[in-house]
Amino acid sequence: MAKTHSLSSKILIGLIRVYQVVISPLIGPRCRFTPTCSCYGIEAVKTHGAIKGSWLTLKRILKCHPLNAGGYDPVPPKINNKKEKK
């Protein structure tokens, strides 16, 4: 079953895709991480929603600089804190 996303999530994902298609080819590959920051952003928004996904993406972008070694840094899994009803 396909997961539906909010309008804000769809807009954020669309903006990231525009960056990937229009801006990223002009500046070349610069990301120090796997997956790239833009792919991370899309996955974070899909997994955690617009607000938390944006926060995770912002933290990731702030870590992507020459003084950080980078490497493999996946999106953290969504934790379900709801207790099962008996």
From Swiss-Prot:
InterPro entries with a match to the protein in the record: Membr_insert_effic_factor_YidD
Cellular compartments annotated: Cell inner membrane
Pfam families in UniProt: YidD
Keyword terms: Cell inner membrane, Cell membrane, Membrane
Main localization (coarse): membrane
Matches recorded under HAMAP family: UPF0161_YidD
Role: Could be involved in insertion of integral membrane proteins into the membrane.
Family the UniProt entry places it in: Belongs to the UPF0161 family.
Protein name as catalogued: Putative membrane protein insertion efficiency factor
The organism of origin for this protein: Pasteurella multocida (strain Pm70)
Lineage of origin: Bacteria, Pseudomonadati, Pseudomonadota, Gammaproteobacteria, Pasteurellales
